[in-house]
A protein has these predicted regions:
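Generic structural motif
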Residues: 28-29, 73, 102, 126, ...
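Acetyl-CoA-dependent GNAT
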Residues: 5-95, 100-101, 113-114, 119, ...
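Short loop/turn motifs at secondary-structure junctions
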Residues: 93, 124-127
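Conserved glycine-rich acetyl-CoA-binding loop
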Residues: 100-111, 123, 134-141, 145
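A generic secondary-structure micro-motif detector
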Residues: 47, 106, 128-129
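C-terminal "cap" of GNAT-fold acetyltransferases
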Residues: 3-13, 126-137, 144-164
Length: 164
């Protein structure tokens, strides 16, 4: 059984979906998030450590993100880290989506993505953007299925947008 207070340093919202699933919304704890990113680095289509400064990323996510954590049967199953601080543009940005290997195939990313979309609506944001590789077919198709459209395609690296 996980302690959500180890994962999130602040909890803004709690959505109990059923007796086995809860989505928590808040700021990720720095130590947890860094450990999580490094532990799951090779799960990403292109490992994060090879393309970003992990410490700077962890600090930015801790400081600026709204993170959605799905807990299923007492275990952290996945998360989405997003930014909703650009009030003038009314545009959010998903910076990281991840479902732990042992929880894949259960449509948990769909649950998290719907929570992010509902959050955007609730704070009157008009758009959510994200970057994804077309070759990362599971992620690319997930976003298409949930109404994201390709805005730009730079050699297979796509900027996608969802509009409320």
């Amino acid at each position: 059984m996980i302690d959500i207070n180890v994962i999130l340093s602040t909890i803004e919202q709690v959505h109990t979906l059923n007796k086995n699933q809860t989505v928590y919304v808040g700021k990720p704890a720095t130590a947890f998030f860094k450990e999580y990113v490094l532990e799951h680095d090779n799960d990403f289509y292109e490992p994060l450590s090879g393309r970003i400064d992990v410490d700077a990323f962890v600090n930015k996510v801790h400081t600026l993100s709204t993170t959605f954590v799905l807990v299923q049967e007492g275990e952290m199953a996945g998360l989405i880290a997003s930014y909703f601080y650009d009030l003038p543009s009314e545009k959010g940005f998903i910076t990281l989506t991840h479902t732990r290997q042992e929880f894949r195939g259960q449509h948990l990313s769909t649950i998290l993505l719907k929570a992010v979309q509902e959050y955007a609506r609730s704070i009157n944001f008009k758009y959510i953007d994200l970057m994804v590789y077309k070759a990362n077919a599971p992620a690319f198709n997930l976003y298409l299925k949930h109404g994201f459209k390709v805005m730009t395609d730079d050699n297979g690296r796509c900027l996608m947008r969802w509009e409320v």
